[in-house]
Amino acid sequence: VDSKSLAKTIFKRITKDVYDEENDDLLFQGHIQGDLLLRKSICEYLLQSRGFKVEAEQLIISSGTEYLFYIIFKLFNNEIYGLENPCHKMFKELFLTNNVSFKAISLDEAGVVVEELKKYNVNIAYVTPSHQFPTGTIMSISRRTELLNWANENPDRYIVEDDYDSEFKYTGRPIPALKATDINDKVIYLGSFSKSISPAIRVSYLVLPKALLNIYQRKLPYFICPVPTLNQKILYRFIKDGHFVKHINKMRTLYKKKREFLVNIIKTYSSKILDKEIYIQGADAGLH
């Protein structure tokens, strides 16, 4: 994240405005799923930018992916998860720490290999279709269809879509989220502001299928949103007033230039110093 480009002045002004409103909500514990206005603003953003409609009651605000996975783990009983291989080491540690069974599922140039999900009797598949970490692969349209078909074959199967790095695609039209083609409500959607704004924001969110929302409300009525009310109201204003979209557009241009600069240096070094051509894996997207 480029800290110099963070909209510090805007955040400072919004913070002052929120305090000046003398809102009593700041003194009390908010809704367990997060501030309603923030959830509604995220729903509007998802419709405009990621291509799918969701209701605010399906959205849960939290302070990190690990918290969201704790919720997901509690929704299911002894299911086998499928993790992309390779993936971020944090996820394997997260699953091991919580004693959750998982299988490492191979990747090819189109994304996760669906046949392996069947082979290992996986019921919950965790995928990063917008920009896989660490390979940089964007899941193909045909593989997305195949993955959704796999989920639709069994009522107990679900897909966890981590829309990691989706804001930063530098060439061509943005690809809609996997959730946008999920007509049977089989995708659990994860989003975060840590990459798009700053890791210090520590606000992430989860969109639950309606069938799982009922289970969540029954099993986790005690699980209170860990994000301070003040932070949620500041982020709501940042989104509502149009600053978030402007920030994303600005950062997309900046990161594209940085990526092009880095790629040119690598190619120049490889041809002049190493005397060989190199292949750069991954799409023109994301921060890695």
Label every model-predicted segment.
Residues 213-231:
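Active-site C-terminal subdomain of aminotransferase-like
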Residues 217-220, 241-263:
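Structural signature of PLP-dependent enzymes
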Residues 60, 176-177, 217, 235, ...:
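Catalytic cores of nucleotide-enabled group-transfer and carboxylate-activating enzymes in metabolic
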Residues 253-263, 274-288:
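Conserved glycine-rich beta-strand-loop-beta hairpin in the small C-terminal domain of fold type I
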Residues 179-216:
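Active-site PLP attachment segment
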Residues 15-156, 166-167, 173-181, 255:
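Conserved core of the PLP fold type I
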Residues 162-163:
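Walker B catalytic acidic pair
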Residues 1-22:
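Conserved N-terminal helix/loop that builds the PLP phosphate-binding region
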